[in-house]
Amino acid sequence: DVEIFAVGVKDAVRSELEAIATPPTATHVYTVEDFDAFQRISFELTQSIWLRIEQELKSIKVKSLTPPRDLSFAEVTSSSFRVSWSPAAEDAIAYLVNYTVALGGEEFVVSVPAPTTSTVLTNLFPKTTYEVRVVAEYPEGESPPLKGEETTLEVRGAPRNLRVTDETTDSFKVGWTPAPGNVLRYRIAYRPVAGGERKEVTVQGNERATTLYNLFPDTKYHVSGVPEYQSGPGTALNGNGATEEVVGEPKNLRVSEPTTSTAMRLTWDKAPGKVQRYLRNLHSRSAGGDIKEVTVKGDTSTTVLKELDPGTAYTLSVNPLYASGAGTAVTGEGATLQERGSPRDLIIKDITDTTIGTSWTAAPGMVRGYRIAWQSLFDDKTGENHVPGDTTNTVLRNLDPETKYRLSVYANYASGEGDPLSGEATTEASPDGKIVKISEETETTMKATWQPAPGNVLNYRVVYRPRAGGRQIVAKVPPAVTSTVLRRLTPLTTYDISVIPVYKEGDGKTRQGSGTTLSPFNAPRSIKTSEPTRSTFRVTWEPAPGEVKGYKITFHPEGDDGYLGEMMVGPYDSTVVLEELRARTSYKVNVFGVFDDGQSPPLIGHETTTLRDAPRSPIPSSGLDCTTKAQADIVLLVDGSWSIGRPNFKIVRNFISRVVEVFDIGSDRVQIAVSQYSGDPRTEWQLNTHKTKKSLMDAVANLPYKGGNTNTGSALKFILENNFRPGVGMREKARKIAILLTDGKSQDDIVAPSKRYADEGIELYAVGIKNADENELKEIASDPDELYMYNVADFSLLTNIVNDLTENVCNSVKGPGGLNPPSNLVTSEPTPRSFRVTWVPPSQSVERFKVEYYPVAGGRPQEVYVRGTQTTTVLVGLKPETEYYVNVYSVEGNEISEPLAGTETTLPIPSVRNMNLYDIGTTTMRVKW
């Protein structure tokens, strides 16, 4: 082999030099900057070359020395083994044995003088591989090594100190001190010493004990424990153990075949284990009783106790006897029989539909209790009660109604039951079973229905007759049928009906009921009560079919017929408010249809008044002040019928106050009269009664509630003839206005009176509330309906129309002779923030103009005023791109005209145009647009 040193000069690549040179590169590769730098590395390079020459010479010399041969190992244990070899050359001085753990660790050296060629290496680790090198020593040096490997054995041994504890009849626990070394498992073998099957179990090597189960009782066992290693089994540890004898108690001690005199049989289930004998004890429970003991063979499980006292209770015990001693005794009780008897004098009482009460005279002797058995004679149902021996009565419950039962009372003694005391009884019919239900009533028929009677019914006998007296009618109904139609009855007549089930033995329990045939007059329908207050509530119904002439309403507190209220309303009324009721009281209401020849059956409803009235918010003031020099005569016609009620009439008064408060009241301004109507109209005050607003408002606040039917047509005619006439304040040149407030449909004609209002130039407003007929309101009101007709669903909603109504009535007061509005509205010159408004003034001169404007989308109105000679103005401060409402009014003093209306939209903000950049520098520029 050639050993190469590489020297690189200047630009030589070191990686190429390292690839060329012999390893290691640290002593075989050198680099210099140029040829002049050789002096720097010459000493180091020369020294490396000489060192390698010396090493090679020594290696050549060693190779010439003869090494030992044939390395072998023997006598391997867990901590030692023997190393042997064949001798080297005759001039070998000694042998050096070097050994170390093969995976790395401290190296040990043993010197063996020649000519010895074997040695034992000791104190080794168990189950460990060692690397061994043997070198022959010569005067000239050491030979090359002879190498080999050997592995020590694992540690193996025997467990110690075998222990047997926790012995039972079929198990004991085996424990031991662990065996040395790495035990994989322990194999525990055991068999009876007297001979038998050998069994074994294994446990983990880290366990120190195990329990052997399913052993024979009272048996000695030979036990052996062997540790198992990876390399094989260790040494066994032997010992003995024994199970305990089975000791227990007999089970299920039973007494049978007792007699009235001297004997009873005692039987038990055998005790476990090898019982030698049973010890039987017998002890009378009476004071001073003797204890009798007798033993029987261990294979016996029954015996007869003799020479006993009659009617006597005994305490009994059976105790098993084993070789090791007594087991546990089983105990019980038994008694000889007594003489038995029967109760007497059975009494049956307090019978209901599901119960029967019974009592009897006590049976003789020591009765422990009574069993009362019952059986239905109609079917297979049975049952029984139990009572203590000192009780002589009971109630049989959960029986079937209307059923015949056989009852038997048995006296229960310690020795059994005596003969029964028997009797029979029949339960009553159930509450529903006693009733005949009536349905499908007509004027001449009704249907009778009843619950089926139990048992074998032959038929039902149906008997009915008028309660007021008359001929009795009898019908027969088959047993499978439980209803029938009674025919040929008199209208509006109450009948008493009886249904009797008929049996072979006789009649059963009677079922009774009553029913009334219908009136030939139909009742109203669908009654509804609502709006309860402390003293009122509303009753509403659907009209009765036919030529009804009116409705009668009666009402009284539930359960108190003595306080009966009654009222009548017309045929077109279908609602009424009942008044002057008790607070927090349930009322029953009857609504009858009244016809020419009689009245219908009642339509019945119920309602409860409240403890206190709910607070009502007053209708707010409209805030309008109707300022005008015009004269007007206004007549309010107010519906005061029963359908309104006092609580709602308070709202009506408040509504009237909000309407009339806007006017300037006086003989030269506005005059207001009020008439109230129901069945017959009446004037509350005339046009000229109140000269001031205060006087008028006081009168409205105290307007009384009239009550009655809704006759709107006659009321309209009434105010034409009684309120719109000169003698009571009507002025010829004043504008004439009528306002009707009603909550129902008129029961008389309204077409002709309404036409008279139009003919006489009277403006007529119609305000309908709740139950008002909208078509009727349109017929009454002046045209157009949008201006003169109002209809709200409830009195509380009057607040929603008070402003519109007041404003429209104010305009009617002003009339067409007021200020004329400007005309010909033109908008122009729109910008993003403004536009111009221009108009043509009215024919008459005005003091000034008011221009009102606000966004169409919503917002607070703004206004500007200009002189009466000016007909244009610019509205500024507006929002860009926004549509505005514009109203222009003529203004003269406190009078203001109707508006001249229009719209205009502002322009959007324009974008920048013609932008130029100039004077551009490094950090600045100018912008022009």
Curated annotation (Swiss-Prot):
Q: What is this protein called?
A: Collagen alpha-1(XII) chain
One cellular component GO annotation, for this chain's record?
extracellular region
Complex and partners: Trimer of identical chains each containing 190 kDa of non-triple-helical sequences.
**Glycosylation positions in this chain:** N98, S231, S324, S415
Native source organism of the sequence: Notophthalmus viridescens
Annotated Fibronectin type-III domain ranges read: 67-156, 158-250, 251-340, 342-432, 434-521, 523-613, 821-910
Q: Which SMART domains match?
A: FN3 (SM00060), VWA (SM00327)
InterPro entries, A to Z: ECM_Regulatory_Proteins, FN3_dom, FN3_sf, Ig-like_fold, VWF_A, vWFA_dom_sf
**Classification via Pfam families:** fn3 (PF00041), VWA (PF00092)
Describe how it is modified after translation: The triple-helical tail is stabilized by disulfide bonds at each end. Prolines at the third position of the tripeptide repeating unit (G-X-Y) are hydroxylated in some or all of the chains.
- Localization of this protein: Secreted, Extracellular space, Extracellular matrix
> What UniProt keywords are attached to this protein's entry?
Cell adhesion, Collagen, Disulfide bond, Extracellular matrix, Glycoprotein, Proteoglycan, Repeat, Secreted
Q: Which GO terms describe its biological process?
A: cell adhesion
Q: Where is the VWFA domain?
A: 1-49, 633-805
Per the record, the similarity remark reads:
Belongs to the fibril-associated collagens with interrupted helices (FACIT) family.
Please give the superkingdom of this protein's source: Eukaryota
- Sum up the protein's function in the record's words: Type XII collagen interacts with type I collagen-containing fibrils, the COL1 domain could be associated with the surface of the fibrils, and the COL2 and NC3 domains may be localized in the perifibrillar matrix. Could play a developmental role in regeneration.
